[in-house]
């Protein structure tokens, strides 16, 4: 029996990353969620015209939504559909996951942050991090640790010569 060829495409499956989230929050754990999109939005995602850096995730009426995410419409987008780049989009999760997130946000004072958007086969997925905000001194210690690790790597590299 012949083996099926795996379709390895060059490039990454990542559409967009929220690098600022790791700087602003302690991310406890991440949960994968689907996202409800319109046709023109999927085309824009394929061309990489999305920004999740200023987005925030919230709970309303037992459902989870993302707001502030900007998907820029393509020039060749449909003329009969009015494109709203910053509309509120619903995130798709199981009821058990939603209840778990609602409990953690209400009890533990955590917040929900969009960290990464990527493709799983032909579906756009978004990782939602359960996070706690950092104080200013936490950010300073993180930057000092990052600088020290960079200097340490430089010293090790020069000592091996």
From Swiss-Prot:
SUPFAM superfamilies: Small protein B (SmpB) (SSF74982). Coiled coil: none annotated. Disulfide bonds: none annotated. InterPro entries: SmpB (IPR023620), SsrA-bd_prot (IPR000037), SsrA-bd_prot_CS (IPR020081). Its main location: cytoplasm. GO terms for cellular component: cytosol. Residues 138-161 are annotated as: Disordered. GO terms for biological process: trans-translation. It holds the Pfam family SmpB. The keyword RNA-binding applies. GO terms for molecular function: RNA binding. Keywords: Cytoplasm, RNA-binding. It is found in: Cytoplasm. Residues 139-154 have a biased composition (Basic and acidic residues). Belongs to the SmpB family. Required for rescue of stalled ribosomes mediated by trans-translation. Binds to transfer-messenger RNA (tmRNA), required for stable association of tmRNA with ribosomes. tmRNA and SmpB together mimic tRNA shape, replacing the anticodon stem-loop with SmpB. tmRNA is encoded by the ssrA gene; the 2 termini fold to resemble tRNA(Ala) and it encodes a 'tag peptide', a short internal open reading frame. During trans-translation Ala-aminoacylated tmRNA acts like a tRNA, entering the A-site of stalled ribosomes, displacing the stalled mRNA. This is SsrA-binding protein.
């Amino acid at each position: 029996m012949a083996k099926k060829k795996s379709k390895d495409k060059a490039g990454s499956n990542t559409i967009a990353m929220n690098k600022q989230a790791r700087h602003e929050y302690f991310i406890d754990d991440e949960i994968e969620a689907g996202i409800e999109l319109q046709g023109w939005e999927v085309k824009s995602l394929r061309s990489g015209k999305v920004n999740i850096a200023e987005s925030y995730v919230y709970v309303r009426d037992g459902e989870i939504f993302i707001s502030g995410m900007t998907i820029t419409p393509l020039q060749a987008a449909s003329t009969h559909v009015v494109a709203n780049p910053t509309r509120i989009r619903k995130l798709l999760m199981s009821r058990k996951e939603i209840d778990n997130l609602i409990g953690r946000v209400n009890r533990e004072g955590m917040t929900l942050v969009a960290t990464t958007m990527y493709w799983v086969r032909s579906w756009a997925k978004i990782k939602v991090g359960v996070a706690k905000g950092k104080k200013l001194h936490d950010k300073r210690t993180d930057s000092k640790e990052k600088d020290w690790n960079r200097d340490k790597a430089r010293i090790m590299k020069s000592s091996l010569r």
